[in-house]
Regions:
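Short, glycine-rich nucleotide/cofactor-binding loops
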Residues: 4-19, 41-48
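Residues at the starts of beta-strands that form the adenosine-phosphate
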Residues: 3, 30-36, 65
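Histidine-anchored nucleotide/phosphate-binding helix
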Residues: 17-32
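A glycine-rich helix N-cap at a beta->alpha junction
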Residues: 52-79
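Anion (oxyanion) recognition and catalysis
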Residues: 29, 60, 99-100
Length: 108
């Protein structure tokens, strides 16, 4: 069974495609597939505690590993302590590791 590794660089407030991506992640996780999500660039915006994004927030209750790019957080002045639950700050090497492990990598 393949693992899925999504890279989200867009925020759900300016790019409606992100909700479709979040729905796909939710469906795959619901089917028992291993799903990870790496938020980068503007994709880190819904990870902030005060941000409202219903489709993104649903992912927090599923078995999905969610990472937020440290550099992108710093650029947007989002402290690691301001992240929503179940989100881990990480560096780009997690993407490289997923690729080397043979995960199906999907970038938006």
């Amino acid at each position: 069974m393949p693992n899925y590794f999504f890279i989200q660089s867009q925020d759900p407030y300016t790019d409606r495609v992100t909700d479709d991506q979040f729905l796909l992640m939710s469906q795959l996780a619901g089917e028992g597939k291993e799903v990870s999500l790496f938020l980068t660039q503007n994709g880190v915006v819904p990870a902030a505690f005060q941000a409202e994004s219903p489709m993104f927030d649903k992912l927090l209750d599923q078995k999905i590993k969610i990472y937020a790019d440290k550099f992108s957080l710093e650029q947007r002045e989002i402290a690691e302590t301001e992240l929503k639950r179940n989100i881990e700050s990480a560096e780009i090497h997690v993407v490289v590791q997923a690729m080397l492990a043979g995960d199906k990598v999907i970038w938006n």
